Amino acid sequence: MKLTKTFKAFFENEKSGGLLLLFVTVISLWAANSSYSAGYIAFWEKDLAGHSITHWINDGLMTIFFLLIGLELEREIYHGELSNIKNASLPIMAAFGGMLIPAATFLALNFGTSTQNGAGIPMATDIAFAIGILSLLGDKVPASLKVFLTALAVIDDLGAIIVIAVFYTTSIGFVNLAIALGIWVFLFVLNRMKVYNLIPYLIGGVIMWYFMLNSGIHATITGVILAFVIPFGDGGEKSTSYKLQHFLHQPVAFFILPLFAIANTCIAIESNWHIGLNHPNAFGIILGLVIGKPLGILLFSSIGVSAGLCALPKNLKWAHILGAGMLGGIGFTMSIFITLLAFKDPEIIVFSKIAIIIASIISGITGFVYLRYILTTNKNT
């Protein structure tokens, strides 16, 4: 399977971005637990136009990340792995299992408790981290495994977006929502009229973001729906969608996601931090990501192939799918993002973040070691 030029560029940026995320996370955790802790934590909570700096990153800059995800998803649907139903069905089935089983695992431990709202936390996959770890294995990785993991993670993020929109919206301001959707319809009309200039779409997107923010629906959803009205054309290098997607890759990989990681891993770990891990919430997150993710991905992929709904690529074995499932358990930035929507209690948020970091480390290490073993030995499984 050949990799397209666009996919290669995406993979390279995500690879480097994943390694950068790892670095800044370590630095942020160190700073939050050093002699600079008080000033460091206070900086991210500093008020800026009525909200903390962290809030502006989470509700503002992350909208740009979701815009890129939307553009990637659009390209996959029109020209990539998701354009052919036979090819798309395997990562779709895998992603479905990779969301359902972790959520069910979490709910099995938390249903009926004050933390049951966190079921969406172990459903997510951090694309940058997962691909970053996979890239460390070098040229041994089959091209189809790279494509599978990327498509799986993109679909996973789409699922996370739907979860955010449906389950983490407490109250809706219908007037603001109607205005936001009206702007989207206007931009859609511009698209159909073949208006290719990017400026009106970006201006409309900013205005739509403002009204979406005040509607009660998480403003980052704006990024995804905006992506689907930006002209795609033939998808070539001169298309509006391609130009924007290409432009956003590096700012997202090397600025927005690292900034999000720094701001949201600013965690002062107390001496009794392990006590919070005895809570069903932490157990649910860790088991959901470490066990539920690979189990769900492998199980539903197997069901899809057995039922004739999809096919396993020729150079992939079930061992590869299991390894990809392990890397899918790296929830990190996306899981933290959902945590901030699911909970209001600062203590629960901190313990949830610690659980996510632990689960992501376990998933990353086990996935890397396992895939390295099977790729090195070329074991037939």
From Swiss-Prot:
Reactions this protein catalyses: Na(+)(in) + 2 H(+)(out) = Na(+)(out) + 2 H(+)(in)
Any single biological process term in GO: regulation of pH
Biological classification of the source: Bacteria, Pseudomonadati, Bacteroidota, Flavobacteriia, Flavobacteriales
Keywords: Antiport, Cell inner membrane, Cell membrane, Ion transport, Membrane, Sodium, Sodium transport, Transmembrane, Transmembrane helix, Transport
Subcellular location per the Swiss-Prot or TrEMBL entry: Cell inner membrane
Protein name listed in UniProt: Na(+)/H(+) antiporter NhaA 1
Superkingdom classification of source: Bacteria
Entry GO MF terms: sodium:proton antiporter activity
Database matches in InterPro entries: Na/H_antiporter_dom_sf, NhaA
Coiled-coil regions, chain positions: none
Protein family: Belongs to the NhaA Na(+)/H(+) (TC 2.A.33) antiporter family.
Function in brief: Na(+)/H(+) antiporter that extrudes sodium in exchange for external protons.
Gene that encodes it: nhaA1
Family annotation (NCBIfam families): NhaA, PRK09560.1
GO CC field: plasma membrane
Bilayer-spanning residue ranges: 18-38, 53-73, 89-109, 118-138, 147-167, 170-190, 210-230, 251-271, 283-303, 321-341, 348-368
